[in-house]
Amino acid sequence: MSKEEVLLNEEIDFKEVRCVSDNGEVYGIISSKEALNLAHKAGLDLVLISPNAKPPVCKIMDYGKFRYQAEKKQKEARKKQKQIEIKEIKLSTQIAQNDINYKVKHAIEFLESGKHVKFKVFLKQRELNIPDAGMDTLGKVAVMLEDIAIAEKEPKLEGKHLNVLYVPKKKEKH
């Protein structure tokens, strides 16, 4: 919550406001000057909580503490968000089958730990016109991963790379 979003003390310029104290005591509908005087007497700030209400609602509180609590809540919410990690595995069109097996084995480990895996097939200049070789390589990978993961989209040509992103399949609850 930024300072620009909240009106404080002298910035509140309404004729009448509904005033509430920090501990929940209701002062009722009073003039904004009177509410400001009450806040100054208590050594606190007058904070506009709900400007769209009729009349607007103000609260007498310690604004610094209010901001600290709001920032703390936002920080906790960010901590609880799940970060999706994407692992990238590079392949070429000339890759041998045992190398594909090795890389897919690692991809399976990543997928089982909940990570997303992006396979990137590098196409050489002569292969850019006919990206079938890259599609064949990704096709081999798709067959090996069909039980564990699903491709989020069809393979897509981006510059000199053919990309496909795999996400773990949802585990069925019994």
UniProtKB/Swiss-Prot annotation:
Q: Give the subcellular location.
A: Cytoplasm
Query: A Pfam family this protein belongs to?
Result: IF3_N
Q: Which segments does the entry list as coiled coil?
A: none
Quick one: a GO cellular component term? Answer: cytosol
Alphabetic keyword roster: Cytoplasm, Initiation factor, Protein biosynthesis
* GO-annotated biological processes: ribosome disassembly
List the molecular function annotations (GO) for this entry.
ribosome binding; translation initiation factor activity
- The protein's assembly and partners: Monomer.
Q: What does this protein do?
A: IF-3 binds to the 30S ribosomal subunit and shifts the equilibrium between 70S ribosomes and their 50S and 30S subunits in favor of the free subunits, thus enhancing the availability of 30S subunits on which protein synthesis initiation begins.
Q: Which family does it belong to?
A: Belongs to the IF-3 family.
Query: Matching HAMAP family, A to Z?
Result: IF_3
- Recorded protein name is Translation initiation factor IF-3
Query: Which source organism?
Result: Helicobacter hepaticus (strain ATCC 51449 / 3B1)
Q: What is the lineage of its organism?
A: Bacteria, Pseudomonadati, Campylobacterota, Epsilonproteobacteria, Campylobacterales
